[in-house]
Amino acid sequence: MGDDLLCADLAAAAGCPVLTDPESLDRASRDETEDLRFRPLCVAEPRSTAEVSAVLRWAHAHGIPVTPAGARTGLSGGALAAHGGIALSLRRMDAIVCIDEVNHQVRVQPGVIVQVLQEAVAAQGLFYAVDPASRGSCTIGGNIAENSGGPRAVKYGVTKDWVLNLEAVLADGTVVRTGADTLKNSTGYNLTQLLVGSEGTLAVITEATLKLLPLPTHTALLLAPFPSALAACQAVAAIFQAGVVPSALEFMEREAVEIGRAHV
């Protein structure tokens, strides 16, 4: 069966958009990883868990590789279709399903932009702590797949520390649920944490329940110059030894400051 017929057969079987135009294939061939390009056979854009399952079931039956992708902001090549096949774009699955104000939880689809989630829960007086530098464009699904962190990791940890449970689809199309809607859950294997950071190699995440905190009532930003990197590191150690845990810490060298000043 030729490539065009394969893609048409996939679209019919999965019931979701399957893109084969040059622009879509070119966009799906790269992420923010430098100098790497891998062109897929096609781009499937499911809108539900059922459609993700149908895509994977079809691909499994035909022996065609599938590479899931979010916003393609990653720097480690996790979204690149290195073996060709189907690029599975989850960008259409971008719903915030439910914000649970009582239990401080939120249930989301993988295509939700992190900043959109942060703003939505903040409107309810809640706080999602994971704050990667690309929060304005990266997705929750990508964060989970890569176990993303950010400057706030110093106090709040990384993505794995905020995932309560997952809905995911295995390579053969089987839909599974992991974990529970509780902070303490010691029942069975910890499949949730097995999937976090797996870069889409074990399953495709289609829904996640995340922990939230009450929104901080006060914040302060401090910019402090130091004569040397050693002095800055010593100051950080002294801050922690004094019992103060900042929500975020960032270090900027003099050269970076000068470049920034020259272009702002």
Q: Which residues does each predicted region cover?
A:
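N-terminal flexible segment immediately upstream of the FAD-binding catalytic core
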Residues: 1-57, 74-104, 133, 256-261
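FAD-binding subdomain of flavoenzyme oxidoreductases
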Residues: 95-99, 105-252
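N-terminal cofactor/phosphate-binding cores enriched in small/glycine residues
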Residues: 71
